């Protein structure tokens, strides 16, 4: 599987405050970005997989809402996370 508990723990440790920090916006955005990259690669190979395309659009929307929240709360954390993950705005 592309996303196991070890990979999640690695993402949470790198972008969150600790391995158990699953709720911070940075760790959630990092997880969404990882899943978006995986689904994008899947859709390049399977162009007619419309269910996955819908899932991808929903994930992008969730990440966008989380980024909008982070802008309102702390603009510096927002700038740091988009620079680190390479997200366009």
UniProtKB/Swiss-Prot annotation:
One cellular-component annotation, GO: cytosolic small ribosomal subunit
GO MF annotation terms: rRNA binding; structural constituent of ribosome
InterPro entries assigned: Ribosomal_uS15, Ribosomal_uS15_bac-type, uS15_NS1_RNA-bd_sf
A Pfam family it matches: Ribosomal_S15
Coiled-coil region: none
GO-annotated biological processes: translation
Keywords: Ribonucleoprotein, Ribosomal protein, RNA-binding, rRNA-binding
Xref: Gene3D superfamilies: 6.10.250.3130, S15/NS1, RNA-binding (1.10.287.10)
Function comment: One of the primary rRNA binding proteins, it binds directly to 16S rRNA where it helps nucleate assembly of the platform of the 30S subunit by binding and bridging several RNA helices of the 16S rRNA.
UniProt similarity note: Belongs to the universal ribosomal protein uS15 family.
Known partners and oligomeric status: Part of the 30S ribosomal subunit. Forms a bridge to the 50S subunit in the 70S ribosome, contacting the 23S rRNA.
Protein name in UniProt: Small ribosomal subunit protein uS15
Top-level taxonomy: Bacteria, Pseudomonadati, Bacteroidota, Bacteroidia, Bacteroidales
